Design a protein with these regions (language model features):
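Short beta-strand scaffold positions
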Residues: 2-3, 26, 137
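Active-site catalytic pocket residues across diverse enzymes, especially alpha/beta-hydrolases
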Residues: 14-19, 35-39
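Helix-turn-helix/homeodomain-like alpha-helical modules used for DNA recognition
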Residues: 1-17
Length: 160
């Protein structure tokens, strides 16, 4: 599962470049369009619903209902912010609900977020840290952030 973030779009481009045989479930119109022309090995499930033009993503009841019919080994998502007290947070209620459903319908949960997302503000709780398995980020986190994530048994993976 790949969410509608630009980070997951970058992951999708890597999947094409590596020519991986994989199944992908997404609510991202950009990712659907990318695989439409970029890979024949990918089994792609594009979730419909109400199109949110700004993020080129499908949101709403229909999207959540369709997503709830699938089960995935892994979900990859980003979010507008990570709150040290509350976990993953979003600025949009509908997108937050989609991300919660990604977590519910997958076995292992990856949050891919650059260093600017840590301690940002947002007003919709997606989920607490107890539901996250791996955080992938680009720069070393503060000791406080490392302690919080490690206290929830979250693996921290640093990448460039």
């Amino acid at each position: 599962m790949l969410d509608c973030s630009t980070t997951c779009l970058a992951i999708a481009k890597e999947i094409i470049q590596e020519n991986l045989k994989i199944s992908i479930i997404t609510n991202s119109l950009r990712i659907c369009n990318l695989f439409h022309t970029g890979s024949t090995k990918v089994k792609l499930v594009c979730l419909g619903g109400t199109l949110k033009v700004r993020s080129s993503s499908f949101i709403g009841y229909q999207t959540t209902q369709a997503l709830s019919q699938y089960l995935a080994d892994k979900s990859f998502m980003s979010c507008p912010a990570l709150d040290i007290d509350f976990g993953l947070v979003d600025n949009n209620l509908n997108e937050g609900e989609i991300r919660r459903t990604y977590i519910k319908q997958s076995r292992k949960h990856f949050v891919v977020a650059d260093n600017t997302k840590f301690s940002e503000a947002a007003d919709v709780i997606i989920t607490g840290f107890e539901d996250i398995d791996v955080v992938v980020t680009n720069k070393k986190l503060s000791k406080k952030w490392e302690q919080v994530l490690q206290s929830h048994d979250i693996l921290i993976d640093y990448c460039e």
